Amino acid sequence: AIRGEDLHYPRTGLICLENAHSSGRVLPMEYMKEVYSLARERAVPVHLDGARIFNAAVSLGIDAGEIASKADSVMFCLSKGLGAPIGSMLVGTKEFISRARKGRKIMGGAMRQAGIIAAAGIMAIEKMIDRLGEDHENARYLAKKLEEIKGIEIMRDRLDINMVFFKLDQGRPEAIVDELYREGIKINPPEGDEWRLVTNLDVSRSDLDTFIARFTKAVKSC
């Protein structure tokens, strides 16, 4: 909520959105438009954490620029789904970027000889965006196969991009993680009672079948 002019509280100086969200959900464009319109009326800038903006664009069937147009500044990640080894991009007006570069220098965030990183980033932008739909399809395939395992509940309302969230009402999480490690698969334990799996360019449909077989075995034995 945007604060009013009550003298007891500071004014709202920035609205931050994330699309796609780390929960796996994609914000609809109608919501983005509403927030941006309200922010402009109140003269409050909007920053978009677009670490997964290209995944959101694929999910919505639109260009990433359309999503970015409903924010004053955007950050997007070159690793994650795009596959670069490191790096993010900050996007905004010329004046904004000038101030950001100054701030980066003040904070000691500059990097020397970073051209090789830029080369990987260019490759990610030019070659990797068009294949993100494959990751989304693999996530849905993974979700479908996981549902065939007794005791698994897929969070279907959060299956918008390349993330699969699920709950498992059997087996001991720590034992399952250890058993999979012995089978050559590393997996994070659940946060609370919720597991998260993410598909990417390094995970093939064959890899998913292998994982499902070994995960099923681990669940039954633990």
Residue ranges and their predicted role:
Residues A1-Q170, E174-E183, I187-E194, V198-V203, ...:
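Conserved PLP-enzyme active-site core in the AAT-like
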